[in-house]
Amino acid sequence: MKLRVVKKHNAAKGCFVCGVNNASGLHTEFYELEDGTMAALVTVQSHHQSYPGRVHGGVCSALLDETIGRALNVSEPDAWAVTVELSVRFKKPVPYDVPLVVVGRALTNNRRLFSGEGAILLPNGEEAATATGKYMKQKLSDIADFESSGESWEVYPNDSDPDYFDLPDTWAVRE
């Protein structure tokens, strides 16, 4: 299922998941797709391993948490997701030093809370880990202090930004 990228999403400088200047971070790039899916591209490095050749489960959980949480921004750009609950199911080992796609989408959305689901996809399209999560909606000013920290929140264009994602049919929006 080929889905067009609608826009690239912002990143911070110091965030562990998306931080462009975080030497220990994942440097994940996030994209909103035409069907409302939030998609992320990441190549996890060997210093994020658990067992040799495998990404640490906590790193996988962080990727899923951030991607599902960002799915709220598709329908509510000014709302931010604070994790209330996250449940992860590990299906296959996640290798490092290979490009991975992480996807997330909102399932339910009300005034204060939203829930979503996500998956880490291996290069062959198989799901390596899946997650469901519940999030409380917050204003950015209530959860982050960009001004006094010197942090920024902006889009960092990249020559390799994709025009589309080819996702497995199992990720098709369920009606």
Positions of the model-derived regions?
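A short mixed-secondary-structure module that forms the rim of ligand-binding clefts
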Residues: 42-68
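Short, flexible micro-motifs
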Residues: 22, 60-61, 72, 107
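Residues that recognize and position ribonucleotide moieties
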Residues: 31, 53, 126
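HotDog/MaoC-like acyl-thioester-processing domains
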Residues: 1-6, 95-96, 107-175
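A generic structural signal for short beta-strands and their flanking turns/coil linkers
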Residues: 24-26, 36-38, 80-86, 98-100, ...
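Non-catalytic linker/capping segments at the edges of enzyme domains
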Residues: 1-47, 151-175
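Hydrophobic beta-strand-centered segment that forms part of the acyl-chain substrate-binding groove
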Residues: 67-101, 107
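Residue-level recognition of well-ordered beta-strand positions that form the cores
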Residues: 41-43, 87-89, 103-105, 119, ...
